[in-house]
Structures are given as C-alpha cells and as structure tokens.
Design a protein with these regions (language model features):
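Short, well-ordered beta-strand elements
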Residues: 8-18, 36-39, 100-105
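Pocket-lining segment of extracytoplasmic ligand-binding domains
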Residues: 131-208
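Beta->alpha turn/N-cap motifs
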Residues: 19-21, 42-43, 54-66, 77, ...
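A bilobed periplasmic-binding-protein/Venus flytrap-type ligand-binding module shared by bacterial periplasmic
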Residues: 28, 88-96, 101, 179-195
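Short helix-initiation/N-cap motifs at beta->coil->alpha
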Residues: 37-48, 124-144
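A conserved helix-loop-strand patch within extracytoplasmic ligand-binding domains
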Residues: 77-135, 165-166, 170-172
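Short, polar/charged alpha-helical segment
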Residues: 18-41
Length: 208
C-alpha cells in the first residue's frame, strides 16, 4: 500500500540514484527546479523510501515500478541500454555456464531479476544466492560469482574473477531488445505541470 500522506507542494522531493549511469538524467535538474529537494540513494532503497511517501518523484527500478498500482512515470526518459550497459555485470571465477553460487548486489532488484531471466534463457543452473552488501569487498566472496551494479561494476576485470558478463549485452544477444533499468516514477495523486515535465527532459539534454 502507498503512503499518500505527503501533500503536493512546490517544494517537491526527488529521489535520485547515486551512480554515474544516472548522472545524465539529473545534470542541471537542481537549477531547472530550484525549489526541489534532491536526495541520492541506491535504487532499492529509493524504491522503499518512495513507497513510504518520502519522495514525490523517484528514479525507480523498472521491476519495482511494474508492481506498483496507480503510479505514473515521466515518458521518454530512463536508465536504459541497447547492448552493453557496463554498470550491471557478473564477475565470475568460473565460466558463466559453470556458476552454481552467486553473491547479489543488494542495490537493485531489477538487475537481480534480469540475471535470473538470463540464466533461465541460457539453461544455466544457479543453486545458491546470497545478498552482497553495498560496502562489501568482492575479494571476501566465497561464491563462484558476484553480480555488481553501479560504479563498482565498471571495472574491466576484478582480480580473482577472470570471467565477466555485461547483462545489457547478454539481454540484447538473447532478445534483440533494449532494456530499461530505471525510470522517473511519479507518486499517485501528483499532477506535474508541463513546465515541470519539461525540466526533466531539459536535464537529460544537458547531460548528453
């Protein structure tokens, strides 16, 4: 259930993902919406905080958004890829088809869901998963592989993990389609003006 106690006001609260891949979407947004309050967090925490009523607008994981009722989004803007995404990758000690255990970055449920679809489509078996904290060190992992998102996923290769798969690239290989990781969700009951919507599109243009 949504918490709709937050009233609509000119000082809207905007939840933003604290990764480099979202920077093009927020470049200049504060100057375009000077009364807005921008707060940065991980995708999964933003989703929880927005649903509890902390944000009017949030850059929310697509899997989370699809499960929400009565919510809308700002069209034409997303964290998306058509092929390599670079910031959502599996780093593995073994060839991908030999992985049996994986540590999963706690920062994004969308990336975990995408990983599971990719494994199913490839008929790869995964017996064990565990959560990998945002401040965790990959070198402490005893699993066969680790799914990383955000800035720390962007290393070419991690020492001790000679195999790597970019999930955006693998999704395109399997389906030929782009993939949307996150979008600007708007809480139920909030009606954005044309100028406010335009500000988000202008921010994207500034970030390109």
């Amino acid at each position: 259930m949504w918490n709709n106690d937050v009233s609509i006001s000119k000082q809207m609260r905007i939840g933003v993902v604290s990764y480099l891949n979202s920077k093009p979407l927020v470049e200049g947004l504060q100057s375009l919406l000077p009364k807005a309050i921008l707060e940065f967090d991980t995708p999964s925490r933003l989703s929880t905080r927005m649903k509890s009523g902390e944000f009017d607008i949030g850059l929310i994981p697509s899997v989370e958004f699809l499960a929400w009722e009565n919510s809308t989004f700002i069209g034409g803007i997303a964290v998306a890829c058509y092929g390599q995404v670079q910031s959502v990758c599996i780093h593995s000690k073994k060839p991908l088809n030999q992985i049996r255990s994986m540590a999963l970055d706690e920062g994004s449920k969308t990336s975990i869901a995408l990983m599971r679809v990719i494994f199913e489509e490839n008929n790869w078996k995964l017996d064990e998963t565990k959560s990998f904290p945002m401040d965790g060190n990959p070198h402490d992992i005893h699993s066969d592989a680790v799914l990383l998102i955000g800035d720390r996923a962007m290393a070419d290769y991690l020492p001790g993990f000679p195999f790597k798969m970019d999930l955006g690239e693998e999704w395109k290989r399997l389906t030929g389609l782009p993939f949307v990781f996150a979008l600007w969700a708007v809480r139920p009951g909030l009606k954005l003006s044309a100028m406010e919507i335009k500000a988000f599109h202008e921010a994207l243009n500034l970030g390109k």
